[in-house]
Design a protein with these regions (language model features):
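Gly/Gly-Pro- and Ser/Thr-rich, intrinsically disordered tail segments characteristic of DNA damage-repair
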Residues: 1-226, 232, 349, 353-357, ...
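Short Gly/Ser/Thr- and Asp/Glu-enriched loop/turn motifs at secondary-structure junctions
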Residues: 112-116, 155-158, 291-295, 340-344
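Residues at or immediately flanking beta-strands
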Residues: 149-151, 297, 344-346
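DNA-contacting surface of Y-family translesion DNA polymerases
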Residues: 10-12, 19, 192, 200-342, ...
Length: 367
């Protein structure tokens, strides 16, 4: 699609929406961190006797194990199922890492959960000409930095982007163009529509609606009369139309990066070498989001897992990458010599505000 492409009946350029969905997120994290779990059916959640499944690996899903299923039922369906207690702080940390990757491409990100988000890349901060290439680059970065797989859907609205990400799971991506949208929806069973639950689906079936095409054959008045305020939504999505914007409604409080060393470090020069790429990453995120901050925080985790943080605030927002590095290195230097070897080093920037730089170029991207 070119810059002049429009959806029929609309004057504005086609939006470029990406839906990113991590594949079996909680379970994949556990399999990543525990090699003994790889290739085995895994359920993250409570005990096999009294709990509920929070997430299931793809190996477990082959036996019909699903999230929100009672653990007793899951164990009955998959006798070899391995239960793992959830580690939500770990999942949250990885989710923040993934969102930092998103922020390098667009500030318009709507998180749906720790493992799922919409991105509006109609205006692309990196100037990549195709939205599908943005999705691929994001997925490759997620894999490289976290060791986890993500699926992506690319389309011109949120409803279709989410359908597209489901279409090539796991570890794939799919594009639904404006030309494909209506035909893609018309063959879809109503139970596959996001936003149509079992009760609504059963009601639609009772009214003779089994696919998107069946919904499309109804009038708006009929849908409103039978489904209230949701009727109009069902009416329009059956036509591939979804006007909902991607809402970036979460105010970012800080931008940070950290790394865990393969072997513990103690020398100042070695730590500075590790600090420099972290500063680079934080500053890239600042550039991507148009943010500037005043407070630099250094995080040090020692080999015995004790954590200390040290902060310093500037009188005005830090203007450049070198200034950020100077302040971060200064915080580290004050702590030398360190009492113990260091396992992890992190740097973050807070007291954020919008930058004074010129607005990034507005690019209408082809899907």
């Amino acid at each position: 699609m070119s810059e002049s492409d429009t959806v029929a009946g609309e004057a504005s350029p086609v939006r470029k929406i990406i839906h990113i969905d991590m594949d079996a997120f909680y379970a994949s994290v556990e399999q990543r961190d525990n090699p003994d779990l790889r290739g085995k059916p895994v359920a993250v959640g409570g005990s096999a006797e009294r709990g509920v499944v929070a997430a299931a690996s793809y190996e477990a899903r082959q036996f019909g194990v699903r999230s929100a299923m009672p653990s007793v039922t899951a164990k009955r369906q998959c006798p070899d199922l391995v239960f793992v207690k959830p580690r939500f702080e770990v999942y949250k940390a990885i989710s923040r890492q993934i969102r930092d990757i998103f922020a390098e491409h667009t500030p318009i990100v709507e998180p749906l959960s720790l493992d799922e988000a919409y991105l509006d890349v109609t205006e692309n901060l990196q100037g990549i000409p195709l939205a599908r290439d943005i999705a691929l680059k994001i997925r490759e970065r997620i894999k490289a930095e976290t060791g986890l797989n993500a699926s992506a859907g690319i389309s011109y609205n949120k409803f279709l982007a989410k359908l597209a990400s489901d279409h090539r799971k796991p570890n794939g991506q799919f594009v639904i163009s404006p030309e494909m949208g209506p035909a893609f929806v018309e063959t879809l069973p109503v139970g596959k529509f996001h936003g149509i639950g079992p009760a609504t689906g059963a009601k639609m079936n009772a009214l003779g609606m089994f696919t998107g095409l069946d919904i499309r054959r109804q009038t708006l008045e009929f849908m409103n009369a039978n489904f209230g305020k949701s009727g109009a939504y069902y009416y329009w999505i059956s036509r591939g139309v979804d006007e909902r914007p991607v809402r970036a409604n979460r105010v970012r409080k800080s931008i940070g990066a950290e790394t865990t060393f393969s072997s513990d470090l103690t020398e100042f020069d070695a730590l500075v070498l590790e600090l420099k790429p972290l500063v680079d990453k934080v500053w890239r995120h600042c550039e991507a989001t148009g943010s500037r901050g005043r407070t630099v925080t250094l995080k040090i985790k020692f080999a015995d897992f004790e954590i200390i943080t040290r902060s310093r605030s500037a009188l005005s927002p830090i203007a450049g990458r070198d200034d950020l590095e100077r302040l971060a290195c200064g915080l580290l230097e004050v702590e030398m010599p360190l009492p113990k070897s260091v396992r992890l080093l992190g740097v973050s920037l807070s007291s954020l505000q919008a930058g004074n730089d010129a607005e990034p170029p507005q690019l209408t991207l082809a899907i």
